[in-house]
Amino acid sequence: MSLNVPSRRLLKSAPSSANALVPALQSLSINTRSIHTTPSQQWSLFGWGKQKVEERNKVKEELKQSELARTRKPTQEEIFERVRGRLEGDSIFADTTPSSQLAAEQDKHKDWATASAEKKLAAAHAKDQTPTGISLKKDHLVRVVDPDPRSRVRWERKMVIRKLQRGTDPWSVEPKAERIARTERKLVYKTGYLPTSVKKLVHLSRQIRGKTVSEALVQMQFSKKKMAKEVKTELLRAEAKAIVTRGMGLGKAAAAAAQKETGAEPVKIQTKDGKHLEIRDPTRIYVAETFVNKGFTRGVELDYRARGRVFKMNKPTTTMTVVLKEEKTRIREHQERVAKKLRQGPWVHLPDRPVTSQRQFYSW
């Protein structure tokens, strides 16, 4: 049989000597109760996550010191020391390579580059080369200017044989086309794509046809058409190309000197359109032919109409081709027309022709 009695009741019923132990027991009970009221950070599962108080205090102290060092303003002596340390060395490579050694290496490199450039220039002047070392000899450039030399040699041999045969044959006559190509000059120039239509550009094309280049330029200068300025620019380009590449229009001074010495009158001709001209310079350039061609469509514009209909309007481009010739050609054509007219003889009202289509009855 057991007896359950509270400890406080036993202590109160104990003698005075036992009463002296009550405060100690109370403090013991308080301390034992404080075990359950400690922070949860001091406790962990199976000993994981335990930190000693000293380590935590050490970490806190380090963080506090770093924060103070970051927020503290530098003193004037520290600022001077930083600036002086930056300006002491010659360069960022002062520890590894002295400045004198770097300067010597740079001078050496400059001398080598200068000598190499002078050597290349001397070799170019001496051996017909460009400064980059490209040879300018004909043998080296044969594949550029003469891609198929064997075919060229065969064609030249064929042309020489043909010329000798025709020159030694008393019955051979030079073809008319070859004679014209040998004695007269011509240039065919095609403009770029102009932002206009064929119907609009054809009027300017007809306006300059048959006129000299100077007259055509004047017509385009005072024309109200939008494309007149473009046509004028293209005419100037065509004239410059004819002078440079074909040697056209360079006999004005020679013709004037010859007329002054001999006192010859200017040549009077009549064009196929019936216009009479006086030609003082046979090398003067004129516009022999002009024609226009349709180009690509440069854009599309929508035309909105009634009842929800939409029409597509194309924006066209057009090119114009100009054929430039010298006045020698017009003189020859005039002479050919006059000779043909003389060969035909006078017109006969009732020529003597044989009777044809005879029948047994009258056909009138």
From Swiss-Prot:
Location relative to the cell: Mitochondrion
The keyword Mitochondrion is assigned to this record: yes
Example GO biological process: translation
GO cellular component, one term: large ribosomal subunit
Keyword set includes Ribonucleoprotein: yes
Pfam families registered for this protein in UniProt: Ribosomal_L22 (PF00237)
Keywords in alphabetical order: Mitochondrion, Ribonucleoprotein, Ribosomal protein
Signal peptide: none
Principal localisation: mitochondrion
UniProt xrefs under InterPro entries: Ribosomal_uL22, Ribosomal_uL22_bac/org-type, Ribosomal_uL22_sf
Domain of life: Eukaryota
CDD domains per the UniProt record, alphabetical: Ribosomal_L22
MF terms in GO: structural constituent of ribosome
Family under the similarity heading: Belongs to the universal ribosomal protein uL22 family.
Record's subunit section: Component of the mitochondrial large ribosomal subunit (mt-LSU). Mature N.crassa 74S mitochondrial ribosomes consist of a small (37S) and a large (54S) subunit. The 37S small subunit contains a 16S ribosomal RNA (16S mt-rRNA) and 32 different proteins. The 54S large subunit contains a 23S rRNA (23S mt-rRNA) and 42 different proteins. uL22m forms the wall of the exit tunnel.
Protein function: Component of the mitochondrial ribosome (mitoribosome), a dedicated translation machinery responsible for the synthesis of mitochondrial genome-encoded proteins, including at least some of the essential transmembrane subunits of the mitochondrial respiratory chain. The mitoribosomes are attached to the mitochondrial inner membrane and translation products are cotranslationally integrated into the membrane.
Protein name: Large ribosomal subunit protein uL22m
Organism classification: Eukaryota, Fungi, Dikarya, Ascomycota, Pezizomycotina
Gene name of this polypeptide: mrpl22
